[in-house]
Amino acid sequence: MIYQVFGPYGSAAINVASCESGLNPGAYNQSGASGVFQIMPGTWAGTSEAGASPFNAYANIVAAHQIFVRDGYSWGEWTCKP
């Protein structure tokens, strides 16, 4: 799914998600970050996927891609970098 959504940035996205959550859609951090890409609730609310669960793998990946594009194709929102 990550390759389908991120296209040419798929490998980098896999690296980020692997580091952030171990590719676990059920991952949760005490900070409130959730899902495959460990997206914070406030950031999640600003995506088109806000009505879905952040633990839905596909929704989390789509939201992460939106954040990535919104930020100028930057991984700045994430602790882990490709």
Task: Please describe what each predicted stretch is.
Residues S31-S48:
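Substrate-binding/active-site groove segments that recognize
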Residues P25, T47-G51:
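Short amphipathic alpha-helical interaction patches enriched in hydrophobic/aromatic residues
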Residues S21-Y28, D71-E77:
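Secretory-pathway/luminal and periplasmic proteins that interact with or process carbohydrate-rich
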Residues A17-S21, I39-G42, K81:
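Active-site-proximal beta-strand/loop segments in catalytic clefts of secreted hydrolases
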Residues V5-G10, Y28-A33, S53-I61:
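Solvent-exposed, acidic/flexible segments
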Residues M1-L23:
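Export/targeting segments at the very N-terminus of extracytoplasmic proteins
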Residues G42-W44, A52-P82:
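Compact alpha-helical subdomains of small soluble proteins
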